[in-house]
């Protein structure tokens, strides 16, 4: 957001964490006009609210960082959450979608939008099973267990399927140092 503020002067955000429809509405209603005439918003939006919000605003960019099982009590299985997000994105087919390429969930999403990927591009080792819980995420093509040349967290990293050859997509944006 800091870089965008340097360019645009003012960026509308929801820093209080109010990320459902009422919080997003309040964020817009209480916003001050931009002095530069350029308007930009960077909003964190609840997965289940995203589709409804897209009925009212048309984002030019979606950034999807991850989906973990921390919301199972609210939304059920991880793939339910993933499909809610895809349904919302489909409402804005001209918006670019920036996905975490390190997540096997985001491999070849069934959306009409232009897609770009970001991720870690650190030193890789030989492909091996992840050291800890990958949340049951399997190869998106053949449902085999994935191996990782680089495993950054849970199911995130430079994954590869030794059964069918599926692997992390080429990254458009890379983090090369920590």
What are these regions (language model features)?
Residues 1-119, 127-134, 138:
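Phosphate-binding loop of NTP-binding sites
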Residues 116-178:
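Adenine nucleotide phosphate-binding catalytic loops in nucleotide-utilizing enzymes
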């Amino acid at each position: 957001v800091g870089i965008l503020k340097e360019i645009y002067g003012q960026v509308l955000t929801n820093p209080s964490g109010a990320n459902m429809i009422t919080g997003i509405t309040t964020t817009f209603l209480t916003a001050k006009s931009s002095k530069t005439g350029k308007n930009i918003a960077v909003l964190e939006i609840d997965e289940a609210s995203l589709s409804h919000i897209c009925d009212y605003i048309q984002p030019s960019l979606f950034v999807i960082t991850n989906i973990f099982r921390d919301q199972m009590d609210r939304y059920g299985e991880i793939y339910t959450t993933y499909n809610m997000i895809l349904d919302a994105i489909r409402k804005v087919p001209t918006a670019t979608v920036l996905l975490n390429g390190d997540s096997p969930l985001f491999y070849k999403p069934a959306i009409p939008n232009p897609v770009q990927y970001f991720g870690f591009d650190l030193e890789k080792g030989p492909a091996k099973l992840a050291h800890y819980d990958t949340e049951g995420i399997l190869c998106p093509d053949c449902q085999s267990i994935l191996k990782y040349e680089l495993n950054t967290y849970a199911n995130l990293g430079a994954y590869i399927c030794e059964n069918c050859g599926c692997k992390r997509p080429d990254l458009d944006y890379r983090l090369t140092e920590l």
